[in-house]
Amino acid sequence: MQALSARAPRVAAKPVSRSGARSAVTVVCKATTVRSEVAKKVAMLSTLPATLAAHPAFALVDERMNGDGTGRPFGVNDPVLGWVLLGVFGTMWAIWFIGQKDLGDFEDADDGLKL
């Protein structure tokens, strides 16, 4: 009687891969159990109290920080930064507005499709 083995057969030599040849694709199937799913959920839920307890510490903002998440508009904590944002936006809009005048009025549906 022949004995059954759970091991995969071994190959003596390594396969040679050529520069143009594709490597073999291996497929692995794993069975998940209810116990492993429950363990993942318990581990995730165990971090929730620590996260909720430390939540006020995440809201501390220093003047050296940039103001993200502090309720300030666009994260601007210095008035000069607001003027810079407004100036850059206004300059880009003015360049676009002046440049689009040369493109025409686009009354025909196919006007914008010319290359």
From Swiss-Prot:
Xref: InterPro entries: PSII_PsbW_class2
Presence of keyword Cell cycle: no
Compartments where located: Plastid, Chloroplast thylakoid membrane
Protein name as it appears in the record: Photosystem II reaction center W protein, chloroplastic
Transit peptide: 1-30, 31-59
UniProt main location, coarse: plastid
Alphabetical UniProt keywords: Chloroplast, Membrane, Photosynthesis, Photosystem II, Plastid, Thylakoid, Transit peptide, Transmembrane, Transmembrane helix
GO CC, alphabetical: chloroplast thylakoid membrane; photosystem II
Organism lineage: Eukaryota, Viridiplantae, Chlorophyta, core chlorophytes, Chlorophyceae
Transmembrane segments: 79-99
Stromal topological segments: 100-115
GO biological process: photosynthesis
